[in-house]
């Protein structure tokens, strides 16, 4: 583990033995201990997201070193690793639970469509550097894997609300239940009121 990987992260509170046991999946498609991963990987935990007050995935990604986050409008973002930033960056593999959300029609990721409830994200794994051998041609500059909680871990009802500088107000609702003992599910909805803005704000 490098200091950069751990900086600003809740894992600083863990012992060396506990750090060695943390598992990630984005580096090689299967679960590995963080100490065994050869790539430069940074993990954003649910605790990190909650403490930061991030209301969207792009805002949460500002915590990852080496990730450039630019806000292009009310709900449009440009996100890249190792430069080459633009509205649709085609050299970055972005996944939700291991499945690519890359849109070949636009040759990039529509971040405004990745609007899952922040409370339902377990962690975000960010890998800097080429990983095309594992994740394909888009993974030239890096990989972002957004891993959500299992449906079995999000049972019951959740209501959330808040606001900010550009997002005047938002509300989210989620319900988790079971069809049977082996088939849990969850459904959610979000609504928001946003200011129109055209300036660019940049992250790391």
Show which residues each predicted segment covers.
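Short sequence motifs at beta-strands and strand-loop junctions characteristic
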Residues: 73, 136, 164-167
